[in-house]
């Protein structure tokens, strides 16, 4: 079972570090998280090693792990959750409109999109190349969807 409701509220406890799916480190758009599990498994290992060497594996010491991974992907996951939540309520007609916009993306733009890579520079590039997408999103914001 892959969680798709976003990030776990807390991923470190005394003597415990949650990584991957158990930490909510999965992209809700495609329900994929192996990249995050590998990347942050390494971070967890590094933080745990430091904690063990210092003989202090309490939550406060392990919090370095949570701060690092949240800094790296929290905004991506939260953005993807917003897209997913909007998609869940779409009618067939609305899906057709959405897909017609997605079909206009290049392969690289599509990959950035499904990776939830919604950084400012990527969004500006999308707005420049795909004004129809931006107009649609603004309309949805005004409509409240």
Q: Which residues are covered by each model-predicted region?
A:
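C-terminal helical "tail/cap" subdomain of flavin- and related membrane-associated enzymes
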Residues: 49-145
